Amino acid sequence: MASMSLSFSSSLCSSRIPEGKRRFRHRDVGIVRCVLAASKSSPGSVTKKRLWKDGEFPGITEPVNQRRTPIKNVKKKLDRRSKANGWVNTVTETLSDLIAKKQWLQALEVFDMLREQTFYQPKEGTYMKLLVLLGKSGQPNRAQKLFDEMLEEGLEPTVELYTALLAAYTRSNLIDDAFSILDKMKSFPQCQPDVFTYSTLLKACVDASQFDLVDSLYKEMDERLITPNTVTQNIVLSGYGRVGRFDQMEKVLSDMLVSTACKPDVWTMNIILSVFGNMGKIDMMESWYEKFRNFGIEPETRTFNILIGSYGKKRMYDKMSSVMEYMRKLEFPWTTSTYNNIIEAFADVGDAKNMELTFDQMRSEGMKADTKTFCCLINGYANAGLFHKVISSVQLAAKFEIPENTAFYNAVISACAKADDLIEMERVYIRMKERQCVCDSRTFEIMVEAYEKEGMNDKIYYLEQERQKLMDRTVATKEMENLPAG
């Protein structure tokens, strides 16, 4: 496995390679327009000499300026201004590109560079995008720091900005911190929490199965005369279904059917189908699909993707194919998620041949692969024992500039464990930490299981110590942030 180890390390540690030309059905050409600022007149202008009396001639004569600026110097000034404007556009475009690619660390570095410039003006939209990015990247502490810096720059907080900060904490399951943000919002008249704020907090409580907090939040919303909308109800509906509380789920759904403010929609339909599909209850899933159709709710692309994924997990390939054909018939596009579900179905059973055929078709149709695509490919090749193709998948992901998130590293670590290459597994784990990618419970589970298989109890002990240190650092950081300023 020496060659495999070398390839893995070089693949993950190499710098990003810009994407080559791809074929797309539709290409949008971006046009960058740089506008040169008009030249200002010289402050030391010569006083104009009048050669007429008032009311005679509306003309003037200007004395010749013997020290007129040479044309070449004017051109140099214009070139400098053009380069400056071009630099501004380049930095802002780079920042937008990094945010779109979810590369939070590089985005913060570019943003810090931008803030040091004299022309910089703080904008609420930029902070909003960065706060959302940090929240989705599992960086609530950095989101809080960015929020504080925003206030120092003189920007006024808004409900939307506070909700984005609150969401950053909820995405990392820091519910107590999220409730603290909620309390701060209540203390500012211009930042009173709205239905979106409560929906975000409700989702966190639902995901953590803290349904007692769900009830208290509903009560608080009622006291503040905030009416739950369909999104709010869908969130709670999803939580009840995930933990198998079908009685409560049915009650929420019944309330939605008789409500005038939050009628069930296609998202409600998708949630119910996902609940039963993930549990493998195909009959219930199909039954509810027909019920929602009878309610007048039309399916969308995501609805069909849910059906395809559910059939794929149960290896019901005929029904999976039927749904795909039905999508074509109704002219619903096959999306990245559609292909991911098919690739995942073949990957789970190690069917590398059909997995590759699906991926090739995906690329031939100009469909863009994402992180999940490569996670499925890596898992599929590992399940098939084709570890050299795991390496090529990692290299291809780097070429396509696929974001390397926690799920991606977990897939590579799992592949190393299945190949019994524990040395490379440790290298990937180190690389994961160097990239400041957050390790989750799955990361440690994979490594502990690999060490247990080899009877390496000392490694397990040190790994548990590592996990405890990680938890302690998180707690210490939170405590430091909560210290009073000054």
From Swiss-Prot:
Q: Can you say where in the cell this protein is located? A: Plastid, Chloroplast
Q: Which domain of life is it from?
A: Eukaryota
Q: Which GO terms describe its cellular component?
A: chloroplast
Keywords from the named record: Chloroplast, Plastid, Repeat, Transit peptide
- Which biological process annotations from GO are given for this protein? embryo development ending in seed dormancy; embryo sac development; pollen development; pollen tube development
User: Is this entry keyworded Transferase?
Assistant: no
Where do the PPR repeat units fall?
A: 123-157, 158-188, 194-228, 229-264, 265-299, 300-334, 335-369, 370-404, 405-439, 440-470
Q: Matching PROSITE patterns, A to Z?
A: PPR
Among the GO molecular function terms of this UniProt record, one is: rRNA binding
Residue stretch of the organelle transit peptide: 1-36
InterPro entries membership: Pentatricopeptide_rpt (IPR002885), PPR5-like (IPR044179), TPR-like_helical_dom_sf (IPR011990)
Annotated NCBIfam families: PPR (TIGR00756)
Sequence similarity: Belongs to the PPR family. P subfamily.
Q: Which protein, by its recorded name, is this?
A: Pentatricopeptide repeat-containing protein At3g06430, chloroplastic
According to its UniProt entry, this protein's organism is Arabidopsis thaliana
What lineage is this protein's organism placed in?
Eukaryota, Viridiplantae, Streptophyta, Embryophyta, Tracheophyta
